[in-house]
């Protein structure tokens, strides 16, 4: 089965993103195809490369990045939600006159079209 995941919670502070990550790993372990993860609302904080968890905590941002690198899972970030929350790539930082960007490598700023496409091409869309 082909799956897509929607994450609406931040990397830390709620269980949503952590549960989504564990679900993603379980899907892959069971032989399912995880096509994409779409980060929306507070979920865009999962793509902030400046996140620095305590040394005894799992680094969820880098975990998502590894999921992308090892399994080719697309990590799409809602551009409107990201800009409102200060998560920007180099292009947007330049366009907005910001000093730097903070979008973690492996994540892509995208519109809601990426979510619509995932919902049309996948068998299941699961939201956390």
UniProtKB/Swiss-Prot annotation:
<dbReference type="GO" id="GO:0002143">
    <property type="term" value="P:tRNA wobble position uridine thiolation"/>
</dbReference>
<dbReference type="InterPro" id="IPR027396">
    <property type="entry name" value="DsrEFH-like"/>
</dbReference>
<comment type="subunit">
    <text>Heterohexamer, formed by a dimer of trimers. The hexameric TusBCD complex contains 2 copies each of TusB, TusC and TusD. The TusBCD complex interacts with TusE.</text>
</comment>
<dbReference type="InterPro" id="IPR003787">
    <property type="entry name" value="Sulphur_relay_DsrE/F-like"/>
</dbReference>
<keyword id="KW-0819">tRNA processing</keyword>
<comment type="similarity">
    <text>Belongs to the DsrE/TusD family.</text>
</comment>
<comment type="function">
    <text>Part of a sulfur-relay system required for 2-thiolation of 5-methylaminomethyl-2-thiouridine (mnm(5)s(2)U) at tRNA wobble positions. Accepts sulfur from TusA and transfers it in turn to TusE.</text>
</comment>
<keyword id="KW-0808">Transferase</keyword>
<dbReference type="Pfam" id="PF02635">
    <property type="entry name" value="DsrE"/>
</dbReference>
<dbReference type="GO" id="GO:0097163">
    <property type="term" value="F:sulfur carrier activity"/>
</dbReference>
<feature type="active site" description="Cysteine persulfide intermediate">
    <location>
        <position position="78"/>
    </location>
</feature>
<protein>
    <recommendedName>
        <fullName>Sulfurtransferase TusD</fullName>
        <ecNumber>2.8.1.-</ecNumber>
    </recommendedName>
</protein>
<dbReference type="InterPro" id="IPR017463">
    <property type="entry name" value="Sulphur_relay_TusD/DsrE"/>
</dbReference>
<dbReference type="GO" id="GO:0016783">
    <property type="term" value="F:sulfurtransferase activity"/>
</dbReference>
<keyword id="KW-0963">Cytoplasm</keyword>
<dbReference type="GO" id="GO:1990228">
    <property type="term" value="C:sulfurtransferase complex"/>
</dbReference>
């Amino acid at each position: 089965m082909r799956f897509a995941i929607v994450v609406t919670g931040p990397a830390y502070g709620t269980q949503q993103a952590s549960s989504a990550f564990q679900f993603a790993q379980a899907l892959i372990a069971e032989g399912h195809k995880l096509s994409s993860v779409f980060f929306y609302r507070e979920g865009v904080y999962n793509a902030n490369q400046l996140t620095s968890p305590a040394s005894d905590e799992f680094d969820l941002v880098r975990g998502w990045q590894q999921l992308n690198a090892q399994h080719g899972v697309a990590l799409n970030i809602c551009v409107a939600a990201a800009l409102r929350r200060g998560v920007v790539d180099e292009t947007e930082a330049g366009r907005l006159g910001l000093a730097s960007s903070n979008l973690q490598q492996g994540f892509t700023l995208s519109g809601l079209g990426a979510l619509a496409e995932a919902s049309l091409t996948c068998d299941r869309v699961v939201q956390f």
